[in-house]
Amino acid sequence: MDTFQLDSRFKPAGDQPEAIRQMVEGLEAGLSHQTLLGVTGSGKTFSIANVIAQVQRPTLVLAPNKTLAAQLYGEFKTFFPHNSVEYFVSYYDYYQPEAYVPSSDTYIEKDSSINDHIEQMRLSATKALLERPDAIIVATVSSIYGLGDPASYLKMVLHLDRGDRIDQRELLRRLTSLQYTRNDMDFARATFRVRGDVIDIFPAESDLEAIRVELFDDEVESLSAFDPLTGEVIRKLPRFTFYPKSHYVTPRETLLEAVDQIKAELKERLDYLRNNNKLVEAQRLEQRTRFDLEMILELGYCNGIENYSRYLSGRAPGEPPPTLYDYLPANSLLVIDESHVSVPQVGAMFKGDRSRKETLVEYGFRLPSALDNRPLRFEEWEAVSPQTIFVSATPGPYEAEHAGRVIEQVVRPTGLVDPEIEVRPAMTQVDDLLSQIRQRVAKDERVLVTTLTKRMAEDLTDYLGDHDVRVRYLHSDIDTVERVEIIRDLRAGAFDVLVGINLLREGLDMPEVSLVAILDADKEGFLRSERSLIQTIGRAARNLHGKAILYADNVTGSMQRAIDETERRRAKQIAFNEAHGIVPKGVRKDIKDILEGAVVPGARGKRKGVAKVAEESGRYENELRSPSEISKRIRQLEEKMYQLARDLEFEAAAQLRDEIQTLRERLVNV
């Protein structure tokens, strides 16, 4: 399946058909930059999916954070179920970079925790780009960081066809050079096991399928994909390509060449340090570098091998490092979502990384060539970026300067118009807000309140709670998963009011929110800029009765521009609806649908039993009222749990065990 096939029950509507036509036209005309100025809820992702389906080009979609990347990944998987939709974000759950603090003589060693599932998805993403013309990669700004050189990476692949002649020992040696390890007991990703002439290999980029290679007299007699848990053969294969375990795997001859170059640089640097009477730094550098070289010669890699990436990729000093962009085919397309946030991120990465590494080089912890293990500079990123579409409700100055064409998508397919805006005095903002909340809660609608400081958000939450308002507070200390759960609870009606400081960054759909209250809207600054105000006001744009109240004593320039722009959009939307006889309809979205991709996409790595368990838990609160109902439910779940255990689905069985325990606790309290 080499062509993009868009699968959707919806047809483009509102401003979408014209926006899609203009974007496709611009791409075919060779425009290097275009901007899709799409209001909240106008279906920007659907428009981009239609563009991809029409131009039939591999696409990199850049998102500003993992939460939005995961949401986009889920949406594109739905739109393109028959194509290769991949996810490329930082694979660190925790990352403490190597650093040195001269003032206290403190060396901080690199410490990290790698998420195995995301590492597998990164490898799957590069494999898709190298093998398939129908790849869509959803990535974050981590895509501008150094990655192994694609030419070296491709040299290392192991390609097997049925009927190939290969000695068993040679096959095992090739697998070892890909950094696969032999493990006959624990069969996991990037391992292989040997049973006579049958070799089972678990590809590094796979999550559910392993490959069985059957040899007969040094000939590949059979290749088959099988389930590593049950051993069931899924299908026979005519051929298969095994990719390395890491993007940094390098051919042996390149390694030997690199070691010689590193030794030459080490000698030069040691002479410099000793001539400048930096004896401690010289001894430190020599000891660390020689240890790394020994590891590279013996194992093919070492901890921190990325610091020698200039030599491993054969690049000249100062040349940009190889990144995900080097893996993109020549005819690729780049889509930058929420570009007003994503583009400035790209520019900021290089500077912070550089200052930390310069200190390490100066004090003898790294060779000067380590400075070339870095993210791309902004101008380098511009040079390697293919044709680009910026997507934002509030494009920034960079987009305004570079966009060859600005395409507006203001009219929503649902006919919904932008929220009404009202300015009210800040003097009585809290009391007025309380009365507004009571009106909305009476209609079973939700409210977002944004404040300027953490202290005020906490105080307001306490005040509203004291007045019997069901309220929660969203702040920066809450991690991504919990943040998603809070938004789920708001939509589900577990509480009615969400107070925060920078709520616009969520980018998640909340159709139940009918009122956005912005306190101290006249305090100019980052949180009350024109762009921030428009984004925050947009949170109420998915509700039929959407309204935004700006509490302010003066109307600032930013406020006036935000109000004027929103009114301009409202006028255009209302005129379109009247001209076409459209009656606005409220958005109704399944809560689980919106959040499907909002946590790191791991669902595809689960088997059926696990997925079924999660569906049940949300029903308890509403359905199970009496002790007899709860007891009946416990018996049903116990039967399922024992069946899953018999089927060796222990992860799913454990989840059911936890559900049963929760129900038993409820039974005691009923």
Curated annotation (Swiss-Prot):
Motif (Beta-hairpin): 91-114
Highest taxon of source: Bacteria
Domain Helicase ATP-binding, residue spans: 25-412
Domain Helicase C-terminal, first and last residues per copy: 429-582
Domain notes: The beta-hairpin motif is involved in DNA binding.
Protein's job: The UvrABC repair system catalyzes the recognition and processing of DNA lesions. A damage recognition complex composed of 2 UvrA and 2 UvrB subunits scans DNA for abnormalities. Upon binding of the UvrA(2)B(2) complex to a putative damaged site, the DNA wraps around one UvrB monomer. DNA wrap is dependent on ATP binding by UvrB and probably causes local melting of the DNA helix, facilitating insertion of UvrB beta-hairpin between the DNA strands. Then UvrB probes one DNA strand for the presence of a lesion.
PANTHER family: UVRABC SYSTEM PROTEIN B
Stated name of the protein: UvrABC system protein B
